């Protein structure tokens, strides 16, 4: 491949803004929706009847978003080209009774969401963000993006073996953040604080979905700014790339043989089994209703699904210079080497030979290099929404993503080239 596409500072700057502004899945879909609106997409409600008009549309349900672009004159049986991603990331989430404390410290009770690198949350300034449910049935987003919480590590003088035997954390006792002093802990203190922050009346908040986040901003790193450090790259990097790709394809308004789709799900990190997860009904419902809105039949629906393809885009593992032996000896994806194609013969990833050919063709069209990832046989392989999408909807699915280090850390690392290379490959795929 000659003169492949390289780093675009504008794309990566925008990714950094997107990461910083999206501390929860609810913020991520709101920010993605704003980008779609600017590109001419319009929101449709699941409770309304859908019309047959062409153009860009999207649905938001909680922390999930499905967006699609219908070309002028698209037949009911027109197949879909789908980019799948997820909006959630591992973190610490606030329990139903959050107010606690001990020995003169005020604390917040949290539960572990997904599989975070727990040590990365220690001694880090944390904010609080998410969604508040109000007495009148409405919801409000909240983002306390300043140092509010901290999980302090035990001093080495009280844990002399930590440097030789490794850090051992009890998930219940050792990860409850502090947020002040005082032994007088009252139920409702945290929610009263949030109500005051948002200018709400006392008692107006009756439910919440709240989570911690690092308040340190994303940043360029390295001698030549070749690296990008930031939170929630797994998997907002893919959500951002998918949004950019879909809006670019819609703006070009070329003669598309497929209907391009972005499916950004919640709850991937804990199994996808929810009404907003990939194992729920949302994607299938949206695709079916798109077919039926264009006067399609169940036969048209079957034809459309049979001809569709999904790229499940989720971050993957770049080879780690300090732990190269943890990777497969002959598959060492490099940071900066372009998107990775994920393969696993036990269907932990959905890629097969024909799927590889589809992605290779998209990368060739985009003049983007790609790499292949296979797990070391002695290490268990993770999974993605890819196999779920393939099994649930009968849609051919290919697992890909950008290569990063420190996956599931409060702060992850990638090469500055890779987000733009991924987005370009997605554009070529959606164009068909």
From Swiss-Prot:
GO terms for biological process: proteolysis. Gene3D superfamilies: Aminopeptidase i, Domain 2, Zn peptidases. CDD domains: M18_DAP. Disulfide bonds: none annotated. GO terms for molecular function: aminopeptidase activity; metallopeptidase activity; zinc ion binding. It comes from the Bacteria. Its cofactor is Zn(2+). Zn(2+) binds at residues 86, 157, 408. It is an enzyme of class 3 (hydrolase). Its EC number is 3.4.11.-. One of its GO terms (cellular component) is cytoplasm. Keywords: Aminopeptidase, Hydrolase, Metal-binding, Metalloprotease, Protease, Zinc. Coiled coil: none annotated. NCBIfam families: PRK02813.1. Belongs to the peptidase M18 family. HAMAP family: Aminopeptidase_M18_2. This is Probable M18 family aminopeptidase 2. It comes from Streptomyces avermitilis (strain ATCC 31267 / DSM 46492 / JCM 5070 / NBRC 14893 / NCIMB 12804 / NRRL 8165 / MA-4680).
């Amino acid at each position: 491949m000659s003169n492949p596409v390289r780093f675009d500072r504008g794309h990566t700057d925008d990714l950094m803004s997107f990461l910083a502004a999206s501390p929860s899945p609810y913020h991520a879909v709101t920010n993605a929706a704003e980008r779609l609106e600017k590109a001419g997409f319009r929101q449709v409600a699941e409770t309304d009847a859908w019309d047959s008009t062409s153009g860009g549309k999207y649905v938001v349900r909680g922390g999930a978003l499905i967006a699609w672009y219908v070309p002028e004159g698209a037949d009911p049986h027109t197949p879909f080209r789908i980019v799948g991603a997820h909006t959630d990331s591992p973190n610490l989430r606030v329990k139903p009774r959050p107010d606690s404390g001990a020995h003169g410290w005020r604390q917040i009770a949290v539960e572990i969401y997904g599989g975070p690198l727990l040590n990365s949350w220690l001694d880090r300034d944390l904010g609080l963000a998410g969604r508040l449910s109000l007495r009148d049935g409405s919801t409000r987003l909240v983002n306390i993006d300043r140092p509010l919480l901290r999980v302090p590590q035990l001093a080495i003088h009280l844990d002399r073996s930590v440097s030789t035997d490794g850090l051992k954390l009890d998930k219940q006792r050792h990860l409850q953040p502090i947020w002040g002093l005082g032994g007088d802990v009252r139920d409702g203190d945290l929610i009263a604080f949030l109500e005051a922050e948002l200018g709400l009346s006392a008692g107006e908040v009756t439910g919440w979905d709240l989570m911690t986040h690092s308040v340190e901003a994303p940043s360029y790193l390295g001698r030549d700014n070749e690296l990008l450090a930031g939170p929630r790259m797994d998997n907002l990097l893919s959500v951002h790339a998918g949004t950019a790709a879909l809006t670019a394809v819609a703006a070009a308004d070329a003669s598309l043989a497929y209907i391009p789709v972005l499916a950004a799900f919640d709850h991937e990190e804990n199994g996808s089994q929810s009404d907003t997860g990939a194992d729920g009904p949302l994607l299938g419902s949206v695709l079916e209703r798109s077919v039926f809105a264009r006067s399609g039949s169940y036969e048209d629906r079957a034809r459309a699904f049979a001809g569709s393809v999904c790229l499940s885009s989720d971050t993957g593992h770049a080879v780690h210079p300090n732990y190269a032996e943890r990777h497969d000896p002959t598959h060492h994806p490099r940071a900066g080497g372009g998107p990775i194609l994920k393969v696993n013969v036990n269907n932990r990833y959905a890629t097969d030979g024909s799927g590889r050919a589809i992605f290779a063709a998209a990368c060739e069209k985009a003049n983007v290099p790609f790499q292949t990832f296979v797990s070391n046989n002695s290490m268990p392989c993770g999974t993605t929404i890819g196999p779920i999408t393939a099994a649930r909807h009968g849609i051919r699915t290919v697992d890909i993503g950008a290569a990063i280090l420190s996956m599931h850390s409060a702060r992850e690392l990638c090469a500055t080239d890779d987000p733009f290379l991924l987005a370009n490959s997605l554009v070529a795929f959606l164009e068909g």
